[in-house]
Curated annotation (Swiss-Prot):
<comment type="similarity">
    <text>Belongs to the phosphorylase b kinase regulatory chain family.</text>
</comment>
<keyword id="KW-0449">Lipoprotein</keyword>
<dbReference type="InterPro" id="IPR011613">
    <property type="entry name" value="GH15-like"/>
</dbReference>
<dbReference type="Pfam" id="PF19292">
    <property type="entry name" value="KPBB_C"/>
</dbReference>
<dbReference type="InterPro" id="IPR045583">
    <property type="entry name" value="KPBA/B_C"/>
</dbReference>
<dbReference type="GO" id="GO:0005516">
    <property type="term" value="F:calmodulin binding"/>
</dbReference>
<feature type="modified residue" description="Phosphoserine">
    <location>
        <position position="10"/>
    </location>
</feature>
<keyword id="KW-1003">Cell membrane</keyword>
<comment type="pathway">
    <text>Glycan biosynthesis; glycogen metabolism.</text>
</comment>
<comment type="function">
    <text>Phosphorylase b kinase catalyzes the phosphorylation of serine in certain substrates, including troponin I. The beta chain acts as a regulatory unit and modulates the activity of the holoenzyme in response to phosphorylation.</text>
</comment>
<protein>
    <recommendedName>
        <fullName>Phosphorylase b kinase regulatory subunit beta</fullName>
    </recommendedName>
</protein>
<dbReference type="GO" id="GO:0005886">
    <property type="term" value="C:plasma membrane"/>
</dbReference>
<feature type="region of interest" description="Calmodulin-binding">
    <location>
        <begin position="912"/>
        <end position="943"/>
    </location>
</feature>
<dbReference type="GO" id="GO:0042593">
    <property type="term" value="P:glucose homeostasis"/>
</dbReference>
<feature type="modified residue" description="Phosphoserine">
    <location>
        <position position="19"/>
    </location>
</feature>
<keyword id="KW-0112">Calmodulin-binding</keyword>
<keyword id="KW-0597">Phosphoprotein</keyword>
Amino acid sequence: MANSPDAAFSSPALLRSGSVYEPLKSINLPRPDNETLWDKLDHYYRIVKSTMLMYQSPTTGLFPTKTCGGEEKSKVHESLYCAAGAWALALAYRRIDDDKGRTHELEHSAIKCMRGILYCYMRQADKVQQFKQDPRPTTCLHSVFSVHTGDELLSYEEYGHLQINAVSLFLLYLVEMISSGLQIIYNTDEVSFIQNLVFCVERVYRVPDFGVWERGSKYNNGSTELHSSSVGLAKAALEAINGFNLFGNQGCSWSVIFVDLDAHNRNRQTLCSLLPRESRSHNTDAALLPCISYPAFALDDEALFSQTLDKVIRKLKGKYGFKRFLRDGYRTPLEDPNRRYYKPAEIKLFDGIECEFPIFFLYMMIDGVFRGNLEQVKEYQDLLTPLLHQTTEGYPVVPKYYYVPADFVECEKRNPGSQKRFPSNCGRDGKLFLWGQALYIIAKLLADELISPKDIDPVQRFVPLQNQRNVSMRYSNQGPLENDLVVHVALVAESQRLQVFLNTYGIQTQTPQQVEPIQIWPQQELVKAYFHLGINEKLGLSGRPDRPIGCLGTSKIYRILGKTVVCYPIIFDLSDFYMSQDVLLLIDDIKNALQFIKQYWKMHGRPLFLVLIREDNIRGSRFNPILDMLAAFKKGIIGGVKVHVDRLQTLISGAVVEQLDFLRISDTEKLPEFKSFEELEFPKHSKVKRQSSTADAPEAQHEPGITITEWKNKSTHEILQKLNDCGCLAGQTILLGILLKREGPNFITMEGTVSDHIERVYRRAGSKKLWSVVRRAASLLNKVVDSLAPSITNVLVQGKQVTLGAFGHEEEVISNPLSPRVIKNIIYYKCNTHDEREAVIQQELVIHIGWIISNSPELFSGMLKIRIGWIIHAMEYELQVRGGDKPAVDLYQLSPSEVKQLLLDILQPQQSGRCWLNRRQIDGSLNRTPPEFYDRVWQILERTPNGIVVAGKHLPQQPTLSDMTMYEMNFSLLVEDMLGNIDQPKYRQIIVELLMVVSIVLERNPELEFQDKVDLDRLVKEAFHEFQKDESRLKEIEKQDDMTSFYNTPPLGKRGTCSYLTKVVMNSLLEGEVKPSNEDSCLVS
């Protein structure tokens, strides 16, 4: 690449000619002591006019990506920074009374650009509507437009347009600029469009995108990833725009933007889970700087901020700027400019010669100003100064990047940092890098104290740590401060007779009629009200998508069409899924919801939590647990959360009230109908009957002879006859399942269609607590639990993968968030291979795991892949161990709350008291690995030219080591993929132990390496053979193929498994060549 345009135009001879621009020599020349404010601002005004505004399109207001050669393309995020640069200088000119019209000019240059982007976006309103319903790379807003016409450029196949960070940055700067007094939004069409952009951004936590660098994963192969920088910018934008009036001081109630607090909170949790990583393939990335610092200031946790920033600086900072990320091939001489995507392992070529970008020194300068760290400002200003160049007029220019010329590449790789780098003065990237120019203006205005941080951050995205407790924030970025929140609780009984019954136990409740005129709504009615938010027929926008309202949303009071409305949380909905019939699970959900509200409630005013008590909750054995919970409410503390129980009318004064004024209904429009929660009416003096809900003895068992194996081959007539005679619900479900598969759901039985008959059996079995029958019926009806997709997302954002499918059968790996419909199809396709009940119990586990991993992530340490089928296998194994010599309890007969407790039991890492066979079986089923396991496999691979083999799966040394880095998430997943072929949990755990042994042996013997493939199966076989020889010699036991005794042997100690594994590993290594060392004392000469 020595003859590349970049190299040619960077030569000293050409720089001296002045035809492009020269190194900046005058930047440190002393200015007059008596320089006036006008002179200072005039200096920057001329820079802005000459290096930025002269390139702004006179028609759209957009800025081109390149400033030479008639460039047609304009990228949204670059134009946004240009607008911000002009706006920042306008803010400085506000300090001068007679500004000669410059404030107006600069402000309206920014407004023109912002409205230009809005114009481009609004022409794609159909894409917003599609993306809102189905977020995919082929339904998103474009990120590149024609600079002169605003037309969309480049198809989805030609360019990765899915860049949520661009939309988020637009919303963030929109709020900041309007807050400073600019008028950008003109009418209600634009307000409704912005509201719909918010709907799109709310779901960022589950939408992998291409990121700031437009490349997706680090491998640049067209795949998308969940990026911390995108999620962080979305979080910041949502916090800034929540409750914001787009008309500024002249606004009214219907120009206010609404944000779903629960969706925002999921973005917050996702961001904290991903950091300090940027994504699965990016261990760190300079794109995190604008996320954690200016302009987003997305982090509330100071420790996490420091950890993330330190990692960026440590790994990416150089003499000429920051690398974007490690092994970034962008504009390096070894990158092929004619290919959009890289080949496998190609990124290894760019290791150590990544371009360095001075723009990130500017971000660090701005960060220093905001944090009052003058040393940081000076440090990065001193680093930046020698990198700046100047135009022929003498104005400073920030080069886009500095690169290593082709002739110097080998020397740079041998000795990093030794070679001179050259700036990207022109060539493919144009004369000026406008993003850098804009940020230079902002940084210098701040450093010279011509504007203050409060000027360019009027909504106070950045708040110093010492002020965070006292600042009136917009609900959510006050951070994880310790709080002593008291949750207000109102107890509502569904009928008057239930109220009287509870009163006899000293539990004071209210009925829906007694709280009037306040109405009690299920959250689904609130969702219906929100359908009207952002609706716009002219633009073809339908308003808020059908998404449930979470615990934070239902903890507010709403004013809707003159009514005062409170909502009970979704956990009290009468779900179609059987888990809601387990009252112990309901109590657990209530405690979890209260703890969640305590942790994440950041609003002024107290949360209002409605507890809805139904008559069905207190029947039979359900009564005592419910009574204990209500007594805990009365005492004022439940699950570690302080609560205050009172009448709803009393609590309403301290709550947060949300005015839903977007429900503007004209006289000609029909009022939307909302159904409030109705009180159950019963005859006077009737009493609540606490009838038993325990299973009748005959119902609990199958009728003799009714098995799927026997009856699936009998005629339909025979099955119908047996169905009519069968009084056992379990038998009926089996027979109905056979009919369903054979004849279809609409086949007529004595009790209507097959599907209706199964539904009735499902209800009856639920009331009798016949959980195995309930699960089979639920599976036959293809029922799906609520919150399935969010639960899987909770697992994914913790850096894990989820696999669905039965143990020993094909599994589906989920790496990115999916829609509920897709997850349902996977579950019912993969899980019903050998037992119909598997599909629904896997859903139960997904819900439980989603909750547990959010609240106790340490229980999943060492588990990179959450294999649901294998976890079920571990639970069944645990039941066998507990049963001893007796028949094991059937997992499917346990209640959902018992299943959850069993899951928690096996997840506990301390398994002391168990035999080693049981430990290995459980840990293998959970896919648990020791600390630093994947790093050690990397080190093994470095010393194994032909790779590693296990269970027929080969992990090659190349291109693995070339394509990846040691600490990369994708390498760990590759190792998991290799181990995924092992079909026995305890054997998998022995393989994990073997890999740790191999790593330690290689670490202590640097002169050794494997000459051939490391066949792990062969090594275990040889170790077991050695173990058998010792067993037969010492204990006089005949050799057996059964490895149970080996699995049950402790790893350490005399004749532990590690002793045998170490022996065979050393034998294998010593069969190869020993590499001599200069320090080897065995050498004679």
